[in-house]
């Protein structure tokens, strides 16, 4: 089993997740543009909820994942910097995850009868990133390129 820390800050919601020995811990907050203020306290709260000391958390982590967008460029940089810092301290792998693919995968697991999913991620004001995914035996696969559209 992989012990994983996940960080997503590319949108208005700041999310962190930790999976250690099959136990899952998750925190999400609607923070708009305060990711830089909330991310580290959320990571600390997650670590405490998991009952791990700081050194113990760094010892058990195999990988650190972060949402690489699309979304806020500053938000992606915050997640990437935090993931890089934790992974470096833990000697863990860094994994970049497409935010639209992760969203589509989660939606496809809830929509049992759907053959595909379209993800829409707000960029700013009336601009949205859209991507179409089809369901596969092991998840989802993008079938239409990511597009930025005005709504």
Per-segment meaning from a language model:
Residues 1-70:
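N-terminal beta-alpha supersecondary unit
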Residues 1-2, 12-13, 61, 90-92, ...:
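Short coil/turn connectors at secondary-structure junctions
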Residues 22, 28-34, 93-149:
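Surface "functional belts" at beta-alpha junctions
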Residues 41, 45, 84, 88, ...:
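Short, well-ordered alpha-helices that flank and scaffold nucleotide-derived cofactor binding pockets
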Residues 52-58, 87-98, 112:
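Phosphate-handling active-site elements
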Residues 67-96:
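DPxDG-like acidic metal-binding loop motif
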